[in-house]
């Protein structure tokens, strides 16, 4: 780590011999002529704009007074006018008439951007959802390389109490209730290192839309958060390379034109180097992940590695058509051997894969009517083997398999009624093929402990309407699902109402109903990896019912004098949940209990922004409870997601090319159940863990060489004061003798937080 830090300072020293041009200047305008604005920019940044006078002379321009970079002010020009600023080289720019706006961009206008910089540059909030551009996001506390799922955890109401990137609890929901899409490809394992980092390369040029309420009815399949990731459809004019390395992995992202303005290719790859070098960062994550297991140090013989690759081909045959083909590969491999004695070896292997591809076709038939077609395929595969060899001829083994095949198509139409209203409607069909197998065997015999294979086809129709009435905005919607295998259906109304009282105050209210037939259940079999003891199952409307959620929310946004106050209160109830208390090795179906639950809470954000710094505070209150007739005497008890209070405060400061940010995070303890002296459950989530807290800091420095290549270095420190918290108490099923198969007995395992962890990165854009 010391060598990596020295490398950063060395690179900073090299940069000092390069161009020292100031990167930001103060601008402020109120209805000024754009010709004057361009002249001011030319003088400040020593650049030149070429344009046709008739395009610019009639344009006026307004801008809040603060520091702006050249890129930022060019973006504002494009945003406020029907113009496009094109970079010719480092000094010369041309101002042209912008390409004709398509219907999707008009829809975005109706989804007004309420907050331009929410927490940080690169994060916006519309009246319906959040938009994150990872490649533009400023450094966040403790986050390296703008990890998408870790960045989401900075938002109000998003928690990960087990300190993973993928374990997102959104408004009382669990991680399997979140739908994650990548260009339409369903992701069932969006993490590396057992979920400690996201498997979505944040350095790909893409946008992330995050929904936690009033979800557009084109989205179904899950009952909690929606994370819709879309890589760019733009065809670059020249080769672009973005590459980097941090303390865990190296990555590269390449965009290149194949046919000018017609055909473009983008590819990305990211791979760990932990099989050759175990950094202190990896060792810290390893210690966290493999608590309460027999895994020790990793080396060339005992390895854990991961990689992800993606590719996208964009084809624009004409001005009204766009066709793109996307592919994605995510893989995690574990191979660990433990020599117990000379003639006995314990070997554990795990392979987790998520593959997928999608085809997107957008066709604009007129200025008002657009068609979109999506075809997708996704495969998730989990393969775990635990084997103990006693000698050449004797062994015992346990095998666990879980497989999900998800494929389908969507036909979507958009009709722009007028400048203030838009209609979107369509049809979807997709199939889910899900299976799992638990098998125990030796050299003489094999026993299937659990085997399940189900298939379902879902047909869905949806419609969504947006209408502006002056200061009112209405967005009603409806989705209908038919689940063919179980012959069940669901109607899902959605509604968002927004009222703008004045320039400072916006009121909102929303309602939605959603359903879910895919879910994860916990198994307590012979698996030594507590973070991977869940399997995907499909609802059969019997053992595993359909989960259904209703959510109501209301709130307001207040903006004035660089202050922002965002308050949103909500209530949601859920039916069809199950409590898999005993695992798959139980002997009767009564072990699966059906229940219901509710979550009520409020999310609050206060933010202050000025030219060179920003500070914010978020607070969430939440009460989340479940009820099962056969458990806890039928009384409600706290759910695993019930964290009553969470609070964080953060601050970032920019000095020219240097950005520093820090944040302190606190939440009250999770609930946990207790067991008695006999190893039986004594209470259900009646006790609380200690409060959790940590301090994170991050810093980055960006510079350019005379050729215009951009370099960026950064450091993050997670849990600066190395505070160790108990974050989880988990039951582990005991199978000491035959009686344990009849009367369930458990042991309690304690799991602790990460200690202090450093990370460092270096990136280059060519």
Segment roles from a protein language model:
Residues 322-371, 379-405, 452:
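Flexible loop and strand-edge segments within Gram-negative outer membrane beta-barrel domains
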Residues 274-276, 280, 666-676, 701-766:
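C-terminal beta-signal and adjacent terminal beta-strands/loops
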Residues 468, 473, 570-573, 592-675:
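Gram-negative outer-membrane beta-barrel transporters
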Residues 78, 124-176, 184-202, 207-215, ...:
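Periplasmic N-terminal accessory/gating domains of Gram-negative outer-membrane beta-barrel systems
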Residues 381-383, 438-440, 484, 503-552, ...:
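Surface-exposed extracellular loop regions of Gram-negative outer-membrane beta-barrel proteins
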Residues 248-273, 290-333, 353-371, 375-377, ...:
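Transmembrane beta-barrel wall of Gram-negative outer-membrane proteins
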């Amino acid at each position: 780590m010391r060598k990596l830090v020295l490398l950063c300072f060395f690179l900073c020293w090299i940069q000092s011999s390069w161009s020292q041009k100031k990167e930001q200047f103060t601008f402020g305008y109120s209805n000024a002529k754009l010709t004057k604005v361009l002249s001011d920019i030319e003088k400040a940044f020593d650049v030149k704009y070429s344009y046709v006078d008739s395009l610019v002379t009639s344009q006026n321009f307004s801008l809040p007074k603060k520091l702006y970079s050249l890129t930022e002010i060019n973006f504002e020009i494009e945003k406020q006018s029907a113009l496009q600023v094109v970079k010719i080289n480092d000094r010369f720019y041309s101002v042209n008439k912008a390409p004709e706006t398509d219907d999707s961009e008009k829809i975005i206008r109706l989804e007004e951007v309420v907050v331009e910089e929410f927490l940080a540059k690169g994060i916006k909030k519309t009246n319906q959802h959040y938009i994150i551009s990872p490649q533009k996001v400023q450094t966040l506390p403790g986050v390296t390389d703008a990890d998408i799922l870790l960045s989401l955890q900075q938002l109000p109401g998003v928690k990960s109490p087990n300190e993973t990137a993928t374990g997102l609890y959104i408004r009382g929901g669990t991680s399997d209730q979140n739908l994650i899409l990548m260009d339409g490809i369903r992701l069932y394992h969006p993490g590396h290192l057992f979920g400690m980092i996201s498997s979505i390369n944040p350095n790909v040029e893409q946008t992330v839309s995050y929904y936690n309420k009033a979800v557009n009815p084109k989205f179904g399949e899950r009952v909690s958060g929606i994370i819709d990731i879309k890589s760019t459809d733009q065809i670059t004019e020249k080769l672009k390379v973005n590459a980097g390395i941090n303390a865990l992995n190296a990555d590269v992202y390449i965009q290149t034109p194949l046919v000018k303005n017609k055909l473009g290719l983008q590819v990305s790859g990211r791979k760990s180097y932990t099989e050759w070098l175990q950094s202190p960062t990896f060792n810290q994550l390893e210690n966290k992940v493999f608590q309460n297991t027999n895994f020790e140090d990793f080396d060339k013989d005992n390895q854990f590695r991961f990689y992800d690759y993606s590719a996208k081909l964009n084809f624009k045959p004409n001005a009204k058509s766009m066709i793109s083909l996307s592919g994605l590969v995510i893989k995690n491999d574990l191979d660990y051997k433990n020599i117990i004695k000379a003639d006995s070896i314990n070997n554990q292997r795990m392979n987790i894969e998520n593959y997928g591809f999608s085809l997107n076709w957008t066709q604009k038939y007129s200025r008002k009517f657009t068609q979109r077609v999506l075809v997708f395929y996704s495969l998730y595969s989990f393969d775990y083997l635990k084997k103990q060899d006693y000698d050449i001829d004797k062994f015992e083994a346990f095998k666990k398999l879980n497989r999900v095949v998800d494929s389908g198509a969507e036909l979507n139409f958009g009709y722009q009624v007028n400048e203030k209203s838009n209609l979107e409607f369509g049809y979807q069909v997709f199939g889910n093929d899900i299976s799992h197998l638990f098998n125990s065997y030796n050299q003489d015999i094999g026993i299937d402990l659990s085997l399940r294979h189900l298939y379902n086809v879902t047909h869905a129709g949806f419609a969504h309407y947006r209408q502006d009435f002056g200061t009112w905005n209405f967005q009603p919607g409806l989705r209908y699902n038919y689940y063919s295998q179980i012959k069940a259906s669901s109607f899902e109304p959605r509604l968002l109402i927004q009222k703008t009282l004045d320039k400072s105050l916006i009121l909102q209210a929303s309602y939605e109903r959603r359903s879910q037939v895919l879910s994860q259940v916990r198994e307590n079999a012979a698996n030594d990896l507590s973070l991977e003891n869940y399997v995907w199952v499909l609802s059969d409307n019997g053992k595993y019912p359909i989960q259904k959620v209703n959510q109501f929310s209301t709130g307001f946004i207040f903006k004035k004098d660089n202050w922002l106050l965002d308050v949103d209160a909500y209530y949601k109830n859920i039916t069809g949940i199950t409590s898999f208390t005993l695992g798959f090795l139980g002997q009767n179906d009564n072990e699966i209990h059906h229940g219901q639950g509710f979550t009520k809470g409020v999310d609050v954000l206060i933010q202050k922004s000025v030219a060179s710094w920003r500070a914010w505070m978020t607070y969430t209150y939440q009460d989340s409870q479940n009820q099962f007739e056969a458990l806890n005497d039928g009384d409600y008890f706290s759910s695993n997601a019930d964290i009553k209070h969470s609070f964080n405060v953060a601050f970032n400061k920019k000095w020219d090319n240097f950005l520093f940010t820090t944040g302190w995070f606190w939440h009250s303890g999770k609930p946990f159940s207790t067991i008695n002296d006999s190893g039986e459950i004594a209470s259900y989530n009646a006790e609380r863990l200690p409060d959790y807290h940590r301090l994170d800091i991050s810093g980055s420095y960006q510079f350019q060489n005379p050729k215009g290549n951009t370099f960026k270095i950064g450091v993050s420190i997670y849990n600066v004061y190395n505070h160790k918290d108990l974050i989880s108490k988990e039951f582990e099923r005991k199978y000491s003798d035959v009686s344990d198969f009849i009367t369930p007995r458990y042991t309690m395992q304690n799991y602790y937080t990460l200690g202090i962890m450093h990370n460092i990165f270096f990136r280059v854009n060519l």
